[in-house]
């Protein structure tokens, strides 16, 4: 009798994460898997035995095609960090998970997500090997940040990059409409990888001169040099548009956003929420009187 498969989605959603889910489902059925289960809200939901049978949801080819074009995470997501299974307390979580997988007669485990989700898959695979489990654990790449190792371009990045290019072009149009001095700083996602921020360059075309500056987390950031560069640019043109990554770091390794007074929350994986980079830089530029903002007369 064929083993069953189970698939989950984790981390932030993308425009195409459900296309990956559809691909996993179709591949499992084509290769002879039994039932295909879905985890509701990732491993966090699985620990609470919250699952569904995807065979009951995806009954026709049209259902699958619609799933491919449905944004966000169809199964729901989570940000749950599995503990270290080498500790007695941590191992109880794995024992519980593998008991649930045994009850469902799972032979194939798929997890769609980014780096943190791959961390989850790695831990489950290691523990499975430790206890001699024959379950195959497979990670399915998904991240708009495009920062997964040995992956040239991750599903989700292309859609996000295109979106950023379009939005930046619209912002550039708006910023130049009044003919007054403006500095527009756009903060873009990207903790340690600048692929998304670099996509702001896509705004440049025959009908648009593009952004004036792109600041990436891979390049050490100097606030004084940034202000000086803005000042030089404003002597040449009144309106400047800058794309800056949320994760730009100072030369000493601190995030620029840490210079602000904002409170930064931390998620289950210990990642600090990086917000306020653009606000801090905008306030710094404004404080030095390099920017003049006027309201249009209606």
PLM segments and residue spans:
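Glycine/threonine-rich beta-strand-loop-alpha-helix active-site module
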Residues: 25-61, 122, 126-173
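Short glycine-rich or small-residue beta-strand-to-loop segments that form or flank ligand, phosphate
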Residues: 4-12, 74-78, 107-113, 139, ...
């Amino acid at each position: 009798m064929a083993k069953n498969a189970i698939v989950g989605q984790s981390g932030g959603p993308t425009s195409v994460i459900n296309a990956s889910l559809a691909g996993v489902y179709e591949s499992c059925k084509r290769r002879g898997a039994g039932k295909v289960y879905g985890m509701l809200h990732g491993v966090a939901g699985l620990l609470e035995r919250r699952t569904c049978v995807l065979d009951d949801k995806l009954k026709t080819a049209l259902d699958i095609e619609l799933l491919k074009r449905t944004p966000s995470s169809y199964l729901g997501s989570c940000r749950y960090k599995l503990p270290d299974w080498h500790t007695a307390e941590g191992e109880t979580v794995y024992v519980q998970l593998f008991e649930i997988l045994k009850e469902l007669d799972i032979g194939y485990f798929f997890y769609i997500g980014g780096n943190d989700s791959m961390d989850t898959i790695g831990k489950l695979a290691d523990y499975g090997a430790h206890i001699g489990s024959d379950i195959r654990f497979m990670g399915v790449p998904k991240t708009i940040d495009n920062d997964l190792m040995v992956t040239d371009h991750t599903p989700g990045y292309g859609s996000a990059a295109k979106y950023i290019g379009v939005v930046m072009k619209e912002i550039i149009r708006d910023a130049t409409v009044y003919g007054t001095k403006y500095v527009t700083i756009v903060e873009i996602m990207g903790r340690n990888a600048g692929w998304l921020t670099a996509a702001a360059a896509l705004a440049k075309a025959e009908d648009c001169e593009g952004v004036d500056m792109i600041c990436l987390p891979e390049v050490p950031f100097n606030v004084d040099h940034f202000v000086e560069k803005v000042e030089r640019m404003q002597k040449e043109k009144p309106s400047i548009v800058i794309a800056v990554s949320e994760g730009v770091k100072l030369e000493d390794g601190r995030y620029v956003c840490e210079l602000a007074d904002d409170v930064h929350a931390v998620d289950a994986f210990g990642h600090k929420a990086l917000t306020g980079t653009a606000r801090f830089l905008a306030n710094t530029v404004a404080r030095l009187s390099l920017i003049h903002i006027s309201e249009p007369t209606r």
